[in-house]
């Protein structure tokens, strides 16, 4: 598979997801990813014969569900920077005997499709990984036919308790970790898309949260977080401060413990709008 030119941050993102290629679809997390993909396709109301662009397609969950909807007369193009995830997607597509999906290794922030190329553009869960979301939304707007739809799956700024607590602790050390800030509320989502030129914006809010155990999550979640490029700024702290930050992180989580465990909010917004 051909390589693409990526900046350091995007190379690191691709490496993180390539390391997960064998596990991404598995277990509770894999089921959750699949549920989000199916719900997004449902909210967009993908139809027979449509041409669909799936941005950050990953292991092809959205692409495959959309392909079933568009049928043989439609076409899906899935784009991702992680070659390992695309390899998984290719195998899944072959196993499903679908011939209406084309996968491409490319950066979704610098695509050059012609204007008015797609009936639908979708991006599931990947917006926090992008470097210029407002510009990206304007670019994707140009790809849509008049009246075409964009569909986004994004998260509230209250979602994912480990990330929320990590952001809080990081701010004490002068570090701003941006996660779901741009899409953190329905009003923010609406403003973001309106500014990019979209209209008829509809937002469906759903909750995928659950209670989790502190014993099984604190140390592991800290270590896992530091392996993600978004959190690399924390690694620049002196070792003493980093250990202090970790202790504060665990203390903050401890304050959230109830008799049911810690509530891990997973408020999700399915945003659909037209060109």
Predicted features and spans:
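Class I SAM-dependent methyltransferase SAM/SAH-binding core
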Residues: 51-55, 59-111
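A short glycine-rich, Lys/Arg-flanked "PGG" loop and its adjoining helix->strand segment in the class I
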Residues: 134-149
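Conserved class I S-adenosyl-L-methionine
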Residues: 2-50, 61-65, 85-88, 96, 151-176, ...
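A short acidic, Gly/Pro-enriched loop at the edge of an enzyme's catalytic core
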Residues: 109-121
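A short SAM/SAH-binding and catalytic strip from SAM-dependent methyltransferases
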Residues: 119-134, 156
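Conserved Class I S-adenosyl-L-methionine
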Residues: 3-8, 32, 59-61, 182-275
């Amino acid at each position: 598979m051909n390589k693409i030119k990526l900046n350091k941050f995007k190379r690191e993102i691709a490496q993180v997801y390539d390391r997960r290629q064998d596990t991404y679809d598995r277990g509770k997390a894999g089921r959750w990813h699949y549920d989000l993909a199916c719900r997004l396709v449902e909210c967009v109301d993908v139809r027979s014969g449509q041409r669909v662009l799936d941005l950050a397609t990953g292991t092809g969950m959205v692409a495959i569900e959309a392909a079933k909807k568009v049928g043989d007369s439609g076409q899906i193009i899935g784009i991702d920077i992680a070659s390992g995830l695309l390899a998984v997607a290719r195998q899944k597509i072959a196993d499903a005997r679908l011939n209406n999906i084309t996968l491409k290794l490319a950066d979704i922030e610098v695509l050059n499709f012609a204007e008015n190329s797609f009936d639908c553009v979708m991006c599931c869960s990947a917006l926090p990984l992008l470097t210029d979301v407002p510009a990206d939304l304007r670019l994707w707007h140009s790809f849509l036919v008049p009246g075409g739809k964009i569909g986004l799956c994004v998260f509230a700024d209250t979602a994912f308790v480990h990330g929320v607590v990590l952001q809080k602790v990081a701010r004490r050390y002068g570090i701003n970790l941006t996660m779901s800030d741009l899409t953190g509320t329905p009003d923010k989502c609406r403003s973001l898309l309106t500014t990019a030129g979209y209209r008829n914006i509809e937002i469906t809010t759903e909750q995928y949260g659950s209670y989790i155990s502190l014993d099984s999550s604190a140390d592991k979640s800290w270590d896992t977080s530091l392996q993600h490029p978004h959190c690399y700024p924390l690694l620049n702290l002196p070792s003493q401060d980093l250990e202090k930050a970790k202790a504060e992180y665990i203390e903050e989580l401890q304050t959230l413990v109830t008799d049911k465990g810690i509530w891990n909010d997973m408020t999700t917004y399915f945003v659909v709008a037209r060109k």
